[in-house]
């Protein structure tokens, strides 16, 4: 039907109609060993092109099955695709910026595997195994521009990821390293609801982040500019629709990581488990100066982003030595939460800082006077971002000390906290302070509030300061079950709540100390006034005589019909005018003497 004849190459129209990959015999001219040429049928591979197989700038290695075995290294920046299987076994593997895909994908290395800014995708199963290290890292790029408006940006360039896309079946996504497994802003996703996602390191397992920055600088001169900067973090994500396991022979470290499981979630470390927050920072600095106004303003705001661990059923964290969770949220939808450590367990808060400072000055000047208003306003906040655990039940056991710093620990059923040595429930502290200063300076000719004026200088200064300390107490509570607190030595509860809404509370320890904590606040206000110079005003005697002179003059007008009355009124007016003049002269002399 398609007019296919052996020896004739396929046309573009025929290749477009392929429903599968084929090997076709094509007539070509070949060179024989004696140098002569002849025509022969040569096998030609025709691949059915599918979406994602190849882009305009890449190289393609594709087939129904792709099996690569190398004693040395493999460096791939293109596309490797297999309809069924992609198997790569090499001394070392560097997968940089390209893609590897297949129904099943297996990467094995006798040394290290580096996946940077690249993806590996499988439908049913994905295995990455190295004797040395496995690194999956997203790449970043830096852009900048100059001139009047300068900027610099460090942003994600290519996201690195390992993916199993089949939602049905028991899909497996496995990453195993003899030494370290390191994720940097990487994506690990397994869509199989009955599958397993596991990251296993013989040494250290790190779920890290890439730091991203953006800054701008608009500068007219050293007194007029506007600058801003932002630092954020692209974090790693491990998501599995089924069970998820993270295991390290030594340390397991999570930095603001997002880890989720549709079913169970387990984190295990032979030594320490450390979950720390990433702190994003935004800052600005502005200055503006004109003849009548100047402004200098700066601000810094932090955002604490902690690790989030979530699962549909049970969540287990087990450390051979210490378990430390800072600003970490752990939540199970329908299962329990269990934390265990051979030594110490700490549920800590991270401080989030917010600062702002504004200085302004306004100047007004005329021929006879001037006024300058200077203000200074600043505020500082340090906020505690605490940890939280929420599950059907919560069990926490430490071989040595267990410390909760403002953590919220809540279970529907039983909640148990146990420490071989000391169990401490304490508060996380937040602080606030602000200061407002204003100074008004007037000079030259000023009104004195009455009939007169002042020539000199006046300064009015006000200050207002406020400070406050607040506390977020730890909460250990059960909605329907019992709460048990057990310590081999001391149980200390400071400013915290222990609640069992429907059950019992049991506390066991050699010593039990319960202490209240009170929030505090303090504020002060000050006002200062200073004035110096010459004040000119009319005295009371001068005002009275002046008013008498006016009254006498008016009386003279009214007495115009009677000559005797006119003469008396005129004499009275002259006397009053003379007295007013004398009084004003006396007042001026008195002011001059002062």
Predicted regions and their residues:
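Binding/recognition "hotspot" determinant
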Residues: 1-594
């Amino acid at each position: 039907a398609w007019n296919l004849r052996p020896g004739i190459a396929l046309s573009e129209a025929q290749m477009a109609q392929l429903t599968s990959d084929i090997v076709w015999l094509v007539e070509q001219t070949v060179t024989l060993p004696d140098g002569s040429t002849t025509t022969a049928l040569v096998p030609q591979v025709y691949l059915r092109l599918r979406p994602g197989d190849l882009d305009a700038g890449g190289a393609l290695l594709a087939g129904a099955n792709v099996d690569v075995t190398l004693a040395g290294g493999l460096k791939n920046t293109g596309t490797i695709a297999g309809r069924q299987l992609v198997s790569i076994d090499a001394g070392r593997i560097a997968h940089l910026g390209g893609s590897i895909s297949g129904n099943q994908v297996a990467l094995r290395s006798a040394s290290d595997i580096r996946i940077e800014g690249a993806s590996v995708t499988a439908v049913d199963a994905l295995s990455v195994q190295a004797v040395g290290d496995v690194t999956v890292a997203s790449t970043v790029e830096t852009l900048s521009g100059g001139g009047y408006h300068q900027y610099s940006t460090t942003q994600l360039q290519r996201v690195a990821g390992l993916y199993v896309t089949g939602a049905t079946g028991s899909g497996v996504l496995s990453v195993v390293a003899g030494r370290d497994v390191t994720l940097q802003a990487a994506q690990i996703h397994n869509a199989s609801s009955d599958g397993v996602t596991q990251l296993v390191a013989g040494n250290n397992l790190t779920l890290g982040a890439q730091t991203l920055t953006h800054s701008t600088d608009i500068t007219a001169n050293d007194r007029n500019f506007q600058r801003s900067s932002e630092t954020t973090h692209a974090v790693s994500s491990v998501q599995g629709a089924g069970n998820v396991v993270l295991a390290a022979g030594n340390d397991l470290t999570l930095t603001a990581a997002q880890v989720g499981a549709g079913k169970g979630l387990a984190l295990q470390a032979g030594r320490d488990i450390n979950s720390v927050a990433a702190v994003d920072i935004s800052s600005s600095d502005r200055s503006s100066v004109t003849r009548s106004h100047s402004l200098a303003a700066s601000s810094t705001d932090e955002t604490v982003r902690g690790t989030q661990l979530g699962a549909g059923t049970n969540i287990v964290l087990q450390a051979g030595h210490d378990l430390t969770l800072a600003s970490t949220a752990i939540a199970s939808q329908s299962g329990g939460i269990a934390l265990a450590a051979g030594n110490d367990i700490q549920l800590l808060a991270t401080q989030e800082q917010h600062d702002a400072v504004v200085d302004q000055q306004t100047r007004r000047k005329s021929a006879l006077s001037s006024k300058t208003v200077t203000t200074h306003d600043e505020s500082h906040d340090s906020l505690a971002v605490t940890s939280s655990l929420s599950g059907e039940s919560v069990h926490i056991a430490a071989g040595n000390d267990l410390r909760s710093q403002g953590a919220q620990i809540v279970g529907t059923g039983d909640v148990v906290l146990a420490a071989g040595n000391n169990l401490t429930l304490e508060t996380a502290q937040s602080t606030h302070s602000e200061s407002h200063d204003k100074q008004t300076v007037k000079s030259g000719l000023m009104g004195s509030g009455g009939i007169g004026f002042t020539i000199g200088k006046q300064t009015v200064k006000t200050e207002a300061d406020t400070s406050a300390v607040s506390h977020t107490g730890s909460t250990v509570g059960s909605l329907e079950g019992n709460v048990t607190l057990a310590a081999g030595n001391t149980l200390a509860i400071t400013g915290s709540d222990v609640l069992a809404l429907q059950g019992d509370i049991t506390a066991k320890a050699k010593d039990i100390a319960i202490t209240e904590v009170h929030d505090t606040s303090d504020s002060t206000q000050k006002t200062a006034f200073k004035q110096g110079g010459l004040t000119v005003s009319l005295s009371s005697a001068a005002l009275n005589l002046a008013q008498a002179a006016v009254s006498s003059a008016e009386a003279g007008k009214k007495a115009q019909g009677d000559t005797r009355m006119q003469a008396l009124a005129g004499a009275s007016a002259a006397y009053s005018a003379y007295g007013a003049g004398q009084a004003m002269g006396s007042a001026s002399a008195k002011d001059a003497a002062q």
